[in-house]
C-alpha cells in the first residue's frame, strides 16, 4: 500500500533540503573565492568570482617559476613556497605517524592492563589537554632552547624539535583509541593467547587489524592539525627556509603590501596534501569498517 505524505511533511523535507544547500553554499563560497583570487590579475582581494582576465602568474610564483612582466622585467618567486610545502608534509607525516604509534600503545595499556593510578593519570591527561598551547609558548621556548644545547636536532629552529613538541598533544587521541579498544571483545585476544600468541602478537595481529578505522581517523586528524598549526611552529622556527607553509604564508601579508593573489595560490596548495592524505586513508577507513572478529 502506497504511503501518502502530508503537505506539512513535504514542506519540511523541502525546507530541510533548501537549508542544506544554503549551508553547503556557505561552506564552498570562501573556497571558490580563494581560487578566484589566485587566478585574478594583480593582488586584489575583491572582485568577481569569475576573473575577467585569468592569469597563472600567481601559480607560477607559488610553484617556484619566475614571470616576465609586460614591460620586460622579470619577477622571481618572492618566497620558497614549495620548500614550505615539503616542510609541512614532512613534519605533518612524521608527527602523525609518531602520534598514532604513541597513542595506540598508550591506549592499549590503559584499556587492557591494570595498574595503580590508571584513572588518575587518564583524568590528568585530559585536564592538561584542555589548556591551549599558547599558554605554554614561553615555557616551550625555554624548554627547547635548553634542550637544543644537549640534543641539537631537538632544539630551536629544527623540525625535530617541532615534531617533538607536537607529540605532547596525544591525550585526546589516547582517550579516543582507548574507547575503541574497549569496544572490542577481549576474548579474541584470550583466544589468541590460548593458541600460543604472546601479548605483543595478540596486540599486533588481532587488535590492530580491527582498529584500522580509528587509527586512520587519528592519523588524518593529527596530520591536519600539524599542517594548519601556527603558534608553536612560528615560535620554534626562525629560519625562512625551515618554515612550514602555514607559517610562511604570513610573509605574503606585509603591512605595506598585501600579496593576496600569491597568498591565495599558496593557500590552495596547502590543501593538496590534506586532500591527498584523506583520499588515501579513505580506503583504510572503508576497509577497516568492514573488518571484524567472528566468535564461534
Curated annotation (Swiss-Prot):
Superkingdom of this protein's organism: Bacteria
Principal subcellular localization: membrane
Membrane topology: Multi-pass membrane protein
Cytoplasmic-facing ranges: 1-12, 112-123, 176-204, 281-296
Transmembrane segments: 13-35, 89-111, 124-143, 153-175, 205-227, 258-280
CDD domains: TM_PBP2 (cd06261)
Record domain ABC transmembrane type-1: where: 85-281
Disulfide bonds: none
Gene3D superfamilies associated with the record: MetI-like
Function: Part of the ABC transporter complex MalEFGK involved in maltose/maltodextrin import. Probably responsible for the translocation of the substrate across the membrane.
UniProt name for this protein: Maltose/maltodextrin transport system permease protein MalG
Organism from which the protein derives: Vibrio parahaemolyticus serotype O3:K6 (strain RIMD 2210633)
